[in-house]
Amino acid sequence: RDLVRSRGLGDVYKRQERVKSGQLMATLHGDIRVLLSGERVALNYLQRMSGIASYTRQIADLLAGSKTKLLDTRKTTPNMRVFEKYAVKVGGGYNHRYNLSDGILLKDNHIGAAGSVRKAVEMAKEYAPFVRKIEVEVEDLDMVKEAVEAGADIIMLDNMTPEIMKEAIRIIDGKAETECSGNVTRENVERLV
């Protein structure tokens, strides 16, 4: 807090502007003791968030011109979610869910407890009939078919090969939004579009 209240922070770049290695990003003015006491923490945050934003931008640029959006995960570093999610947005990505209350995501443990994809979707619709979209994480084409038939709003294709994903998207045929998750990297993302 003292660092922020210090006598001056002069930005020399704009948010989302690309910064080159060695480029001056900001100037600070104030009590040297206050500045030095917060320097390392500020640098750590700046480096981490810049890294997230930069990596996100690299992948978002690969998706430019397609209908595909790059979404983040809810799995963030403890106490850093707001910063990390903001860094994703600055980098050109989109936030998926901020927390568990932002949507219903049925995973393998929910499906196992319910007995089937269909039953899990039915139970979720009973629990929250109008307030949330229901997303189902599926691992194979049988689960895809069941999720479509059950009326899932979003179907997440988890750890599938690009070939199986294409078949899954053919089965879904626009009846639900589609996400892919797991093993998506800068090196393979263009094959998934």
For the regions a language model picked out, list residue spans one by one.
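Glycine-rich beta-strand-to-loop/alpha-helix junction loops that act as flexible
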Residues: L157-D158, T178-V184
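Acidic/glycine-rich phosphate/pyrophosphate-binding loops and surrounding catalytic core
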Residues: R1, R7-E137, D142-A150, I154, ...
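C-terminal non-catalytic interaction appendages of large macromolecular assemblies
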Residues: G182-V193
